[in-house]
Amino acid sequence: MALVLQLLPLLLSKVQGNPEVSLEGNPGDRVNLSCIGVSDPTRWAWAPSFPACKGLSKGRRPILWASSSGTPTVLQHFSGRLRSLDTGIKRLELLLSAGDSGTFFCKGRQENESRTVIQVLGDKAGCRPSGSTHGSEYSKVLIPLLGFGLVLGLGALGLVWWRRSCVPPSHIAPVINAEPQRPLEQDSKISGHLDQEPNLHYADLDHSVLRRHRRMSALVPGDASTVYAVVV
């Protein structure tokens, strides 16, 4: 009974020609749009309730135009889901999709219009297109990982620089100036001087002692015992 009371205003609006109708449905349902009170409709427009769900801006946008050929022109967004049920565009059938919630306007030649408000169950203000949702989730994970990796890299570079600055420089071996090798002639001269060292001892004897010995030998008689003095 309660359900009948809720649907009664909708049924009465269709019978009485109320210019504004409200409909609800799930994605995949088919709903009928009718121009109520408009005798000669020329186009349909749509103002989405949640433009972000379809990546659109706010405001009205035309979705279908009457054509002289009899085949109406449908906006790409509703292509394959919106079709006319008669020779004109007075009655349409729409296959609902997520994000279709909004107000559909039927405009006539005298700029009179009727409105049909459609609420797709599940639509909400925070919805996003599925592609952008996956992209946003991927970016939410990727950006922190990149930031964490950058911090780790900078930390490692800083640690290496700090260790290098704290460690004293390695011991450098003192530079030894190698003496030039002496020629063979100098070596032979040095060896010759070493061989002559015993003769130098005799050459360096104190001659005053020898002279004193001679004087003593002159004063001592010949028969006196000879005294030899060896000076080393």
Swiss-Prot record:
Matches recorded under Pfam families: G6B
Residue numbers on the Cytoplasmic membrane side: 162-232
GO CC annotations, alphabetized: plasma membrane
Transmembrane segments: 141-161
Topology in the lipid bilayer: Single-pass type I membrane protein
Segments on the Extracellular face: 18-140
Keyword line: Cell membrane, Glycoprotein, Heparin-binding, Membrane, Phosphoprotein, Receptor, Signal, Transmembrane, Transmembrane helix
GO molecular function: heparin binding
Post-translational modification: N-glycosylated. May be O-glycosylated.
Record's function text: Inhibitory receptor that acts as a critical regulator of hematopoietic lineage differentiation, megakaryocyte function and platelet production. Inhibits platelet aggregation and activation by agonists such as ADP and collagen-related peptide. This regulation of megakaryocate function as well as platelet production ann activation is done through the inhibition (via the 2 ITIM motifs) of the receptors CLEC1B and GP6:FcRgamma signaling. Appears to operate in a calcium-independent manner.
Note on domains (UniProt): Contains both a transmembrane region and 2 copies of a cytoplasmic motif that is referred to as the immunoreceptor tyrosine-based inhibitor motif (ITIM). This motif is involved in modulation of cellular responses. The phosphorylated ITIM motif can bind the SH2 domain of several SH2-containing phosphatases. The 2 ITIM motifs of isoform B are required for the inhibition of CLEC1B and GP6:FCER1G signaling and platelet activation.
Assembly information from the UniProt record: Interacts (via ITIM motif) with PTPN6 and PTPN11. Binds to heparin.
Protein name: Megakaryocyte and platelet inhibitory receptor G6b
Annotated source species: Rattus norvegicus
Gene expressing this chain: Mpig6b
